[in-house]
């Protein structure tokens, strides 16, 4: 299968950089798959899983939103938070979930409500990915 370059960047590190066969991730409009020679695009990424296929095998990471750019057979992802399942601190994610749920029970201005709703989705995404990959860690 043809490959393309994938680079996943965070403010503090290069999370991933290698040639891959395919990636699948959630945009704000739904799930998208990218393969070699994909048309140029720039799309916002939603909270969810980043699935990477390399050498015929899939690997998943939790991603907390960001931006995807594809051009010239290269995909670049910019995100504040991307984690492999083994990097996820389950206890910290559980505390973040509980904190967000508690705040969402209160009457909040719309901007604060959206911030805590996103925090809840991030925590749930991290917990789900960690649970699904518990046996592999």
From Swiss-Prot:
Which cellular component, as a GO term, is one annotated location?
Answer: proton-transporting ATP synthase complex
A GO molecular function term, named singly, is: proton-transporting ATP synthase activity, rotational mechanism
Could you tell me which CDD domains the record lists for this protein? Answer: F1-ATPase_delta
> Where on the tree of life does the source sit, at the highest rank?
Bacteria
Q: Which InterPro entries match?
A: ATP_F1_dsu/esu_C_sf, ATP_synth_F1_dsu/esu, ATP_synth_F1_dsu/esu_N, ATP_synth_F1_esu_C, ATPsynth_dsu/esu_N
Q: Give the subcellular location.
A: Cell membrane
Q: How does it sit in the membrane?
A: Peripheral membrane protein
Write the record's keywords in alphabetical order, separated by commas: ATP synthesis, Cell membrane, CF(1), Hydrogen ion transport, Ion transport, Membrane, Transport
Q: What is its main location?
A: membrane
**Where does the secretion signal sit in this chain?**
none
Q: Could you describe the subunit structure of this protein?
A: F-type ATPases have 2 components, CF(1) - the catalytic core - and CF(0) - the membrane proton channel. CF(1) has five subunits: alpha(3), beta(3), gamma(1), delta(1), epsilon(1). CF(0) has three main subunits: a, b and c.
What is the documented function of this protein?
Produces ATP from ADP in the presence of a proton gradient across the membrane.
The entry assigns this protein to a family as follows:
Belongs to the ATPase epsilon chain family.
Record PANTHER family: ATP SYNTHASE DELTA/EPSILON CHAIN, ATP SYNTHASE EPSILON CHAIN, CHLOROPLASTIC
Please identify the protein, giving its name as recorded.
Answer: ATP synthase epsilon chain
């Amino acid at each position: 299968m043809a490959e393309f370059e994938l680079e996943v960047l965070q403010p503090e590190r290069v999370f991933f950089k290698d040639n891959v066969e395919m990636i699948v991730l959630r945009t704000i409009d739904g799930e998208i798959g990218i393969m070699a020679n994909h048309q140029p695009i720039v799309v916002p990424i939603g909270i969810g899983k980043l699935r990477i296929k390399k050498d015929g095998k899939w690997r998943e990471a939790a991603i907390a939103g960001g931006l995807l750019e594809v051009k010239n057979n290269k995909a670049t992802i910019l995100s504040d938070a991307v984690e492999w399942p083994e990097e996820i601190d389950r206890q910290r994610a559980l505390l973040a979930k509980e904190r967000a749920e508690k705040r969402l029970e209160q009457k909040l201005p719309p901007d604060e409500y959206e911030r805590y709703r996103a925090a809840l989705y991030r925590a749930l995404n991290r917990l789900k990915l960690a649970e699904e990959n518990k046996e592999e860690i």
